[in-house]
Amino acid sequence: MGYEKSIEAMKIAENLMPGGVNSPVRAFKSVDTPAIFMDHAKGSRIYDIDGNEYIDYVLSWGPLILGHKNEQVIKKLHEAVNRGTSFGASTLEENKLAELVIERVPSIEKVRMVSSGTEATLAALRLARGYTGRNKIIKFEGCYHGHSDSLLIKAGSGVATLGLPDSPGVPEGTAKNTITVPYNDLEAIKIAFENYGDDIAGIIVEPVAGNMGVVPPKDGFLQGLREITNDYGALLIFDEVMTGFRVGYNCAQGYFGVTPDLTCLGKVIGGGLPVGAFGGRKEIMDKVAPVGNIYQAGTLSGNPLAMTSGYETLSQLTPESYEYFQELGDILEEGLKKVFSKHNVPITINRAGSMIGYFLNEGPVTNFEEANKSNLELFSQMYREMAKEGVFLPPSQFEGTFLSTAHSKEDIEKTIQAFDTALSRIV
């Protein structure tokens, strides 16, 4: 398997874009391998410009829950393109997707479409602050909510720490209103509210953390957040940009039975096109302009192509789709445990719906500190060997793998065999 064309393309790209990429993880730095340039894809398969074929578990980092180039989605997109790409005015496609989102997401009575997950979380925080009249937000260590200034912060030391900037260019004055605590730690939340409760506007949380690998909530964690925010008059914000429609038919909140005040969506609701959304109770959402005075706007928000792709994607998902994901996940988990045991390599597997995370340590993995104990050198080796076997995994230990309705049981069996072959060359 060669990467000659990708290597040459990257040399050109590095003179055109920072690091040659438009999103850092695509540089493949953490796995010490050439960045791969993709050419086309269909179903569960993706092909690079060197002609290499892979079973794809990245799926554009989650959006493609139906697999690549779904016929119904592509057909309707062609029809939408022929009508025009953007109008700067409302379209019926916006109504259709909004109705479907409201129907399926328990917390959402009204929704505002945007063009990215970062936009959605940024707007949700502004709305939470405007609605409550408070300043501080709680987030969790290892949870990623986009690249807005107030969320790019470190945890520091201690149980509940006022944030310091985690990226140059983020003013300390901005970061100081973000409190970071360990994921799955209700005691830390209680301490934070005891110290700052009268100025905490809300908690933003991934109901299943997806950017430190896949880390589900402990029993009672999400319910505890709901109770504490209720007690203090703060808002509970679920960032379901990744988990939305991946963990369950009614998103993670439906799966776990905990209803937040606001929900952020993205990825799947665009079916592979740029999209985001935030929504919640009517009384909160009616504070957003033009009804209320909390401003948010976007030139391409609700554009007809993304709305069409999202509607056609969600329309094909049924409760049976999630039963299928469970079946595939069971086969993959059982197979991986057998293979890793055979080679005496420790593995911890975490799952939630169509999201699967594996950590090369003894486990358990319930927070960012435990995720960081994974064997990153072995992960890097394994990534390279799996690519040779025709399996495209996320090039980072701290990203989850994704299943689609296009994946077959044969794909899963081939993947398990690929892990066996890869490990036999490494250990």
Swiss-Prot record:
GO biological process, one term: protoporphyrinogen IX biosynthetic process
Homology family: Belongs to the class-III pyridoxal-phosphate-dependent aminotransferase family. HemL subfamily.
Coiled-coil blocks: none
UniProt KW keywords: Cytoplasm, Isomerase, Porphyrin biosynthesis, Pyridoxal phosphate
Name this polypeptide is given: Glutamate-1-semialdehyde 2,1-aminomutase 2
A GO cellular component entry from the record: cytoplasm
Residue numbers of N6-(pyridoxal phosphate)lysine PTMs: 267
Taxonomic lineage from the root: Bacteria, Bacillati, Bacillota, Bacilli, Bacillales
Catalyzed reactions: (S)-4-amino-5-oxopentanoate = 5-aminolevulinate
Assembly description: Homodimer.
Native source organism of the sequence: Staphylococcus haemolyticus (strain JCSC1435)
UniProt-listed Enzyme Commission number(s): 5.4.3.8
Compartments reported by the entry: Cytoplasm
InterPro entries, A to Z: 4pyrrol_synth_GluAld_NH2Trfase, Aminotrans_3, Aminotrans_3_PPA_site, PyrdxlP-dep_Trfase, PyrdxlP-dep_Trfase_major, PyrdxlP-dep_Trfase_small
Gene designation per UniProt: hemL2
Highest taxon above the source species: Bacteria
Main location: cytoplasm
